[in-house]
Structures are given as C-alpha cells and as structure tokens.
Amino acid sequence: MIVLKDICKKLGENQVLDHISFHISPNENVGIIGLNAAGKTTLLNVIAGVLKPDSGFIRVGGSENVFEDKKMLRKLSYVSGMRHQLWEDLRVKDSFENGIKMYHLDEKRAKARLEELEELFEIKDLVHMRPQKLSLGERMRCELVYGLLAEPQILMLDEAMIGLDVSVKYKIMEYFQEYRKKRQSTILFTSHNLMEVENLCDRIILLDKGTVIFDGSVERIMKEFAPLYRMKMKTEGVLPDFDDLPLEKYGSCRMELK
C-alpha cells in the first residue's frame, strides 16, 4: 500500500508538487502521466525516498521513511530513463553480481533468475560490455533487468521504455503484467506514450503543474479527455516516422488511418 496525503515539494522557487493525495493498493498497475514539468519524476522520487517532501504524509508499504528503512528499500525498485543504476566503469555482468551481493540475495536463486531475465530481455550478448558502449535501448533493457534482480514488491518505472524496439517493448510489458499477477506487486509507470500506459496500467493519475487533475480508469480518461485533443495530418506515399513527433509539446495521440 502506498499512501500520500497533502504532499508538497518545492525545487528552488518552483512548487513542483502541490498538495498531492492518493493511495495505491497492492496488485495495482498505475500510470502517472502529464506533460513535461508536471511533477511525475519528482513524485516518484518522493515515493522512493530519494527526495523528502516539504510537507504532508507518506507511507510506503508500512514505512514512513523509505530511504532509511533497509528492509523496505529491498522491496522497492526504481528504474529511470534519466537516472541510471549500472556502474559505468564495470561490465553489465559485474553490476548484476554487485547487485546480488548488495541486496543479500540467495546466489543460486538469483543467478537462475538472472539467466531467465537475460533471455527474455535479449541482453545475453550485452552483459560483457560496459554501459557507455551500449545504445540507449540496450542500456535500458539492462537497467530493467538490474531493477528486477531483487524481485521487488513495488516497481517504479520512470520513462523506462525509452529507446526500446516496439517488439521488445511489448514483450517486456507482457512480462510486467505476469510479474504483477505472480507477485501481487505494485507497478508505477510514467510515460509520454499513452499507448504504453494503456497496455500496462489499470488506473491513471494525471498531473498538471504539480496537482492531480484526474485519477481513474484508462477507459474513463479516454472518454473524458481524448475528444479534447485532435491532430490532422496529410501525407502522400510513405508515412512519416511518428516516433519523431514532438510528444513533449503535444502529448500522446491516437492515430486513425483512412
């Protein structure tokens, strides 16, 4: 269970989180969406204990101070496209081995699990390389595997699908769905891609300028907000690369081809 009540956080002079309140039950997949500077990453940092709120109440899995609760930290994993966990000067394989030791995992069980994850995330050929030699998508696959090593009860994914090929991305999201069912875990997921959120999440929290302006089902947000945003495009011949659309400006969109 994650409980937030009247959470406020300033960064400099900016009020990034403004009286945020909600609770998340075990076995929920929750998408946290919003335009750039809406407060998504700061919110996850507060939940993870990386940042302390200026005011308000927070409880994560029974703990009111996640950052100082070692048992709770082992149950929580935070994978970010902007904040990396792998050691830069070590091979990916060495980072995994360090993670097994750091989390005090059963070595035999952890290595068997690691072998399974390396196969699923298609990184067997990458583990002998250093992170700086990897492409963004390759690195994110390795970061995701590292984040899953300790079989976390709460998994936070902050733009963690960036750079991934579509086929790999949706295979990974299927895995997360199965993982949640098997572990009765909680997944918090931020993305600019609403289609990703639809595929992974049951519930959406929409932030705007640090406040919650919507909290409900995927179906409800589509019904209430989708009619407000439309984009018309004309093209001939080969379709443009829609991955290059400026989503940070327009947000995600649905596309209908006629």
Describe each model-derived feature in a short phrase.
Residues 173-188, 192-257:
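ABC transporter nucleotide-binding domain
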Residues 130-134:
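Conserved ABC ATPase signature
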Residues 88-102:
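Q-loop/switch helix immediately C-terminal to the Walker
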Residues 56-67, 72-73:
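Conserved ABC transporter NBD signature motif
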Residues 97, 101, 108-126:
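Conserved ABC ATPase "signature" region
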Residues 48:
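Helix-to-loop junction immediately C-terminal to a conserved catalytic motif
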